[in-house]
């Protein structure tokens, strides 16, 4: 309900309470244009109402007849009401002290990092740093992450994060398959690897023909494997000397992957020093809450020879136009949006925000602080080992860092019972053994309580911690010869910012370098950079969500699972499908899971041979990359001159592959920003030839409430909660990529049997390390839907379409809109064709993107899906004022181009070719350009009161790839 201004109500009869309640207030804050602005934009487009515009844009044949069936969430909640409802769910969770371990540990997030990174929109609303000149802050933070990982693992180079430890291990397996022993298809996994890691590896290996063998680590050299995975320390706590084994594996022609605990590596000899080829792991215990499984930043580090085969993103150092150091994403030609099915991985979203948190944890503590934490954890474990031995229990492992396995025999059930009474979780290793893993939050009081549990089970008295500390000096823990002697984190960044004042200023200096949604609109097509409301973000830091172990007993996670069930039903309503799994922790993983589900469906019908996946030429690069990972053969379907799927070519390809057609992958609205009129026909053709229809949900922001893939012929889709449903992009992650399916596919949704999560017996294997993936950020989407309600979610979609058409209409006289539907209308994004400009002026799409930085904008998506174009997506959250500011910038840039075309500006010495302009360049004593300093820095008047300065000039991408350097830059280079 839209309230009148209070001044107009002063002299009237008092309104009822119902009329004054503001349940819709959040929607008015989320949707940028108010009613007057919307009408003004509609007038520009020639429509009387938003409904009339939508009728003209979306084919009537696929329009949703009913309002979103959100059940109890159909009516919007106020921000306070939604927070209270979610708090009630959170309070149903029980926060126990968890010593379960198995790759997840409680941790202290330094308050300065919590407030100034995790809770700071300058960090969490940024996009992936594809435009390096306006991303130097987060690129530096990610470079710190890479340096931290490389130092601690002892390997040459690390990437800028992966999704979780299990998927990182699977990526390492496929990396070694591409580069290793050609005669073998065997990957050997030691039997003390984390069980969730083994399950994800099995899932990944099956469709691409890799045979996974498991057994004792000692037998690995005889396995004739192209790669071997070792855990260091092992899941049960053992710290083993793998030097001789690694040599033997290499001698047999294999390579070694080590899943290593980074905190342990501050005191243990790193894998790179004893011959490992690849190291993977999780950085969660570096200040990132457990969060019921995620999100956390995994890492993958390699020897130098594998650097060009690494999956994921990689930050490298180059120089800018002035020869100064500049950071950028390196080796981007490896990535799926360029190489498609030949990419090194399908990973797109990773875990940038969490990687930044982990790197800042290392910056804040420094090498001495990290080692002190590690030694304290190890000492607590040693005291516990001494204490339980005094109580008559035997430890299974004599060597350990933080984890002990205790032989509890017939008293095992009692130990768990007594622990539960003290609100303590222990790992259930077996019917006769208990696992205990310590972390930085463990205190001497915690240790005393834990010893009391075992004393109660033993019928004895617990030894005091002080007595143990005085008498346990000689307790063995780390194996002789494996103590770390090499230095790490020697770069100045890890040795300077240890006071909170210094840390606060360092974080501020980095965030000031970047352009995120807190400064301006980010009109990236296919990315949906909408509002990430503060009220949606608040629950992420609640301990009732953050301090829950992913493998905690079910009775402790009632609130979490209830919230997850509700969110799944919300997404079922939005998509028109029958069931949803939230396990995939990125869109790429949801896509991959969906294809595995399709394969499982065909196999259940005796048609496992169906392996051809039709993909339109316009598709996002993750589509063919995911199809390849799922063991499918990619067949490209042509698009017509209007950017639509060529129906004749589709029919021909479907007929040609009728016997082995598995699926088609389409994006809707299309990647060209248009609602294709014949989408139902596309689905029918594929179904008629035995295939399933995969509808990529990347553009779901144009469909919610208006149409639904599950209703116009889709069988499976993935969604991007970090696009449509308001999880922030975090500078390149986290994300959530739920997979939604029709009723006939529901029984194939992913399980995680290794941790006791079995959704359906026929379900595919795990695709993420935790049963619910990145569970701790799911409250963001829950809050968004709860506060919007059915009517306002639909209004948001309509406004996104309105905003896109307004931009297209206003810019069409200056830049051709490449594709449009009937009436010249677009969906929620539009493609501006800059190719004619290149012909007439020599100005490239890259030049325009860089020049937009001088105007205070992040560029739209460049050269996707068509080279030489810009794809613009404004979302519903941007006001008309911000849209007009962007339009004015684009028109002004067009006039600058016209000056080149008409000879009034030089083809090389003009403000576009030299963009972006830094403050240092503009204020330098010498100004060598024909255009003025004012035109360079202040091309429009509005910049006089609100100016963003790019911190570096144009980055030299070619130089950076030729001279690959992916470690922290010495201070002297900035002189």
Swiss-Prot record:
Q: Which domain of life is it from?
A: Bacteria
Q: What is its EC number?
A: 1.4.4.2
EC class (word)? oxidoreductase
What GO biological process, any one, is recorded here? glycine decarboxylation via glycine cleavage system
Q: Which Pfam families match?
A: GcvP2_C (PF21478), GDC-P (PF02347)
Q: Which residues carry this modification: N6-(pyridoxal phosphate)lysine?
A: 723
| Reaction equations catalysed | N(6)-[(R)-lipoyl]-L-lysyl-[glycine-cleavage complex H protein] + glycine + H(+) = N(6)-[(R)-S(8)-aminomethyldihydrolipoyl]-L-lysyl-[glycine-cleavage complex H protein] + CO2
According to its record, what are the GO cellular component terms? cytosol; glycine cleavage complex
Required cofactor names: pyridoxal 5'-phosphate
Molecular function (GO) terms listed?
glycine binding; glycine dehydrogenase (decarboxylating) activity; pyridoxal phosphate binding
Keyword terms, alphabetized: Oxidoreductase, Pyridoxal phosphate
HAMAP family named among the record's database cross-references:
GcvP
Function field: The glycine cleavage system catalyzes the degradation of glycine. The P protein binds the alpha-amino group of glycine through its pyridoxal phosphate cofactor; CO(2) is released and the remaining methylamine moiety is then transferred to the lipoamide cofactor of the H protein.
What family does this chain come from, according to its entry?
A: Belongs to the GcvP family.
Can you state the subunit structure given in the record? The glycine cleavage system is composed of four proteins: P, T, L and H.
Q: What is this protein called?
A: Glycine dehydrogenase (decarboxylating)
């Amino acid at each position: 309900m839209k309230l009148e201004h209070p001044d107009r109500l002063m002299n009237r009869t008092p309104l009822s309470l119902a009329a004054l309640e503001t349940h819709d207030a959040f929607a008015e804050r989320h949707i940028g244009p108010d009613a007057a602005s919307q009408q003004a934009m509609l007038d520009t487009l020639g429509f009387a109402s938003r409904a009339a515009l939508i009728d003209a844009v979306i084919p009537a044949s696929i329009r949703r007849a009913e309002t979103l069936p959100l059940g109890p969430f159909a009516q919007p909640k106020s921000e306070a009401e939604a927070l209270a409802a979610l708090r009630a769910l959170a309070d149903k969770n029980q926060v126990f002290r968890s010593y379960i371990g198995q790759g997840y540990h409680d941790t202290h997030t330094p308050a300065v990092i919590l407030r100034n990174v995790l809770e700071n929109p300058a960090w969490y609303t940024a996009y992936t740093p594809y435009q390096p000149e306006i991303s130097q802050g987060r690129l530096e933070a990610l470079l710190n992450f890479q340096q931290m990982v490389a130092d601690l693992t002892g390997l040459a180079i690390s990437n800028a994060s992966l999704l979780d430890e299990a998927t990182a291990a699977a990526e390492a397996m496929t990396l070694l398959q591409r580069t290793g022993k050609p005669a073998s298809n065997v990957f050997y996994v030691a039997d003390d690897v984390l069980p969730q890691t083994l399950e994800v590896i099995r899932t990944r290996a099956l469709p691409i023909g890799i045979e996974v063998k498991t057994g004792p680590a000692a037998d690995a050299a005889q396995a004739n494997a192209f790669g071997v995975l070792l855990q260091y320390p092992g899941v049960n706590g053992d710290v083993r000397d793998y030097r001789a084994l690694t040599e033997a594996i290499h001698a047999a022609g294999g390579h070694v992957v080590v899943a290593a605990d980074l905190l342990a590596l501050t005191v243990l000899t790193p894998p790179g020093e004893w011959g490992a080829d690849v190291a993977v792991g999780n950085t969660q215990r570096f200040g990132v809450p457990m969060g019921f499984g995620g999100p956390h930043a995994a890492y993958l580090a390699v020897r130098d020879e594998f650097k060009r085969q690494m999956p994921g993103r990689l930050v490298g150092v180059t120089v800018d136009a002035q020869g100064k150091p500049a950071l950028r994403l390196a080796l981007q030609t490896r990535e799926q949006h360029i190489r498609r099915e030949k990419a090194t991985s399908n990973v797109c979203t990773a875990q940038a925000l969490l990687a930044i948190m982990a790197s800042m944890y290392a910056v804040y503590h420094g090498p001495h602080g990290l080692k002190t934490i590690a030694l304290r954890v190890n000492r607590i474990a040693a005291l516990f080992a001494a204490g339980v031995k005094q109580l008559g229990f035997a430890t299974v492992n004599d060597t350990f860092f933080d984890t002990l396995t205790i032989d509890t025999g017939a008293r095992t059930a009692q130990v768990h019972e007594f622990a539960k009474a003290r609100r303590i979780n222990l790992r259930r290793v077996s019917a006769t053994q208990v696992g205990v893993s310590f972390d930085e939050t463990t205190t001497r009081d915690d240790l005393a309580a834990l010893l009391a549990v075992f004393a109660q089970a033993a019928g004895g008295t617990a030894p005091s911690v002080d007595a143990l500390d005085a008498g346990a000096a000689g307790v063995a823990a780390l194996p002789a010869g494996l103590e770390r002697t090499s230095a790490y984190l020697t770069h100045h960044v890890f040795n300077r910012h240890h006071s909170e004042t210094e840390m606060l200023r360092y974080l501020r200096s980095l965030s000031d370098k970047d352009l995120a949604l807190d400064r301006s609109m980010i009109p990236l097509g296919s990315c949906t950079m909408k509002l990430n409301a503060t009220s949606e973000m608040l629950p992420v830091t609640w301990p009732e969500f953050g301090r829950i172990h992913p493998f905690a007993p079910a009775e402790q996670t009632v609130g979490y699972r209830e919230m997850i069930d509700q969110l799944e039903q919300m997404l079922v309503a939005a998509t028109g499908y029958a069931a949803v799994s939230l396990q995939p922790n990125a869109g790429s993983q949801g896509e991959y899971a969906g294809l595995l589900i399709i394969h499982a469906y065909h196999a259940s019908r005796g048609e496992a041979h169906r392996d051809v996946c039709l993909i339109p030429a316009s598709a996002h690069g993750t589509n063919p990359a995911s199809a390849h990972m799922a063991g499918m053969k990619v067949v490209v379907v042509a698009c017509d001159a209007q950017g639509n799927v060529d129906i004749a070519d589709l029919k021909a390809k479907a007929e040609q592959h009728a016997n082995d057609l598995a699926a088609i992958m389409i994006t809707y609205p299309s990647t060209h920003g248009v609602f294709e009129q014949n989408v139902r026909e596309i689905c029918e053709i594929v179904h008629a030839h035995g295939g399933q229809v995969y509808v990529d949900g990347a553009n779901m922001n144009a469909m919610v409430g208006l149409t639904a893939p599950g209703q116009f012929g889709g069988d499976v889709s993935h969604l991007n909660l970090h696009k449509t449903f308001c999880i922030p992009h975090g500078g390149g992650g986290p994300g959530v990529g739920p997979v939604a399916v029709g009723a006939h596919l529901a029984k194939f949704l992913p399980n995680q049997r290794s941790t006791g999560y079995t959704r359906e017996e026929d379900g595919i294997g795990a695709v993420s390390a935790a049963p619910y993936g990145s569970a701790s950020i799911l409250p963001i989407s829950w809050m968004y839907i709860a506060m919007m309600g059915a009517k306002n979610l639909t209004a948001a979609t309509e406004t996104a379409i309105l905003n896109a058409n307004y931009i297209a209409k206003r810019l069409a006289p200056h830049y051709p809109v490449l594709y449009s539907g009937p009436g010249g209308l677009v969906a929620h994004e539009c493609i501006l064709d800059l190719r004619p400009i290149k012909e007439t002026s020599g100005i490239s799409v890259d030049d325009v993107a860089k020049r937009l930085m001088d105007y205070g904008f992040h560029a739209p998506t460049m050269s996707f899906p068509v080279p030489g174009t810009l794809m613009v997506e404004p979302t519903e959250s941007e006001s008309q004022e911000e849209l007009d500011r962007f339009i004015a910038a684009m028109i002004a840039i067009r006039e600058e181009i016209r000056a080149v075309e008409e000879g009034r500006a030089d083809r090389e010495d003009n403000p576009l070719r030299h963009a972006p302009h830094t403050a240092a360049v503009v204020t330098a004593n010498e100004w060598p350009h024909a255009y003025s300093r004012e035109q360079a820095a202040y091309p429009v008047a509005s910049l006089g009161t609100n100016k963003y300065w790019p911190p570096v000039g144009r980055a030299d991408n070619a130089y950076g790839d030729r001279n690959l350097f992916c470690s922290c830059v010495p201070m002297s280079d900035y002189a």
